[in-house]
């Protein structure tokens, strides 16, 4: 049990962002979290195998007057533990509906404690990570002047990077966004290149991310959720996993954000360079003309952003692949 509780504690501390549930009362606090499947913590279904692409967690906290708080943890509607802890810190995140909860070592509860029923009221919120949340919390970074300690990075997908808790990604500049008020897509370079080069198989995992993602902002994932994502940097054309030059398959209007107007209509493919550290846009990819000639993209529309720690955590917790890339076992 000690080994299980250590793994459970690490999972709760390092892979969950908490949403306060409307079932809270003055005496009972209820928090919910939804997070992608963990590389380190494996909840088991009644059939004996993991059977979902998400982990829904309900946390019920009771604080008796003369003892430490004790907590009951439900995962995907199954009670997995009732335990106590000497340390429990709840910190609301400013300007969001999230809370961060830190758990000290989990220990056995008093012998007379009864496991409370799952009190949470399931109401999946429809909010998603927005471009404004990214823009207002991120830093614009010059690729040649990366902050100290961030020179070593891991490539995510075709054009994003992770280093020391932060995601680096090119984002459409606010000046260009103001010129395209009707543009509704998540304005990351990863998303734009994905739209240009993805295949037409809607169940393709690399191109659409099916059964890989959750939306942790919702606090709960419905069983019929398709697990796709419109914002995760892991989404990459399945063809790009096999070769560097990938044909353009649709959304050609988006080429105006990447290339000079005089050559857009002649571009047939994208060539990916897969740089291993954050760099300028023209070192990430180029265009390929119908003649086979390569042409540089234009950089003016794009800023390299260093996402805040909190936004980076949201994106990591949303994705099984990002978790495997970015999280360490604790």
Curated annotation (Swiss-Prot):
Interacts with cytoplasmic envelopment protein 3 and with the capsid. This is Cytoplasmic envelopment protein 2. Keywords: Host cytoplasm, Host nucleus, Late protein, Virion, Virion tegument. Plays a critical role in cytoplasmic virus egress. Participates in the final step of tegumentation and envelope acquisition within the host cytoplasm by directly interacting with the capsid. Upon virion binding to target cell, a signaling cascade is triggered to disrupt the interaction with the capsid, thereby preparing capsid uncoating. HAMAP family: HSV_CEP2 (MF_04039). The gene is 33. It is found in: Virion tegument; Host cytoplasm; Host nucleus. Its main location: virion. GO terms for cellular component: host cell cytoplasm; host cell nucleus; viral tegument. InterPro entries: Herpes_UL16/UL94. It comes from Saimiriine herpesvirus 2 (strain 11) (SaHV-2). It comes from the Viruses. Belongs to the herpesviridae cytoplasmic envelopment protein 2 family.
């Amino acid at each position: 049990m000690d080994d299980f509780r250590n793994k459970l504690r690490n999972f709760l501390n390092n892979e969950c962002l908490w949403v306060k549930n409307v079932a809270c009362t003055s005496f009972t606090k209820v928090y919910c979290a939804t997070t992608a499947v963990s590389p380190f913590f494996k909840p088991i279904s009644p059939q004996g195998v993991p059977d979902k692409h998400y982990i829904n967690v309900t946390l019920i906290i009771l604080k008796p007057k003369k003892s430490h708080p004790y907590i009951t943890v439900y995962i995907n509607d199954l009670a997995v533990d009732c335990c106590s802890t000497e340390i429990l810190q709840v910190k609301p995140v400013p300007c969001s509906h999230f809370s961060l909860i830190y758990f000290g070592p989990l220990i056995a509860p008093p012998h007379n404690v009864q496991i409370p029923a799952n009190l949470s009221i399931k109401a999946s919120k429809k909010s998603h990570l927005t471009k404004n949340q990214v823009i207002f919390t991120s830093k614009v970074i010059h690729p040649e002047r990366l902050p100290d300690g961030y020179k070593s990075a891991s490539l995510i997908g075709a054009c994003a990077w992770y280093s020391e808790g932060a995601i680096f990604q090119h984002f459409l500049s606010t000046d260009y966004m103001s010129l395209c008020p009707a543009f509704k897509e998540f304005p990351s370079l990863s998303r734009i290149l994905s739209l240009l080069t993805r295949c037409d198989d809607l169940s393709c995992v690399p191109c659409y991310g099916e059964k890989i993602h959750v939306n942790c902002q919702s606090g709960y994932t419905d069983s019929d959720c398709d697990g796709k994502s419109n914002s995760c940097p892991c989404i990459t054309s399945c063809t790009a996993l096999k070769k560097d030059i990938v044909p353009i398959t649709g959304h050609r209007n988006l080429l105006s954000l990447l290339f000079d107007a005089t050559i857009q209509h002649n571009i047939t493919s994208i060539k990916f360079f897969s740089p291993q550290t954050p760099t300028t846009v023209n070192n990430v990819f180029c265009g390929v003309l119908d003649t086979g000639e390569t042409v540089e993209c234009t950089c003016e529309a794009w800023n390299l952003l260093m996402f805040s720690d909190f936004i980076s955590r949201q994106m990591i917790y949303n994705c099984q692949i990002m978790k495997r890339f970015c999280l360490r076992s604790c």
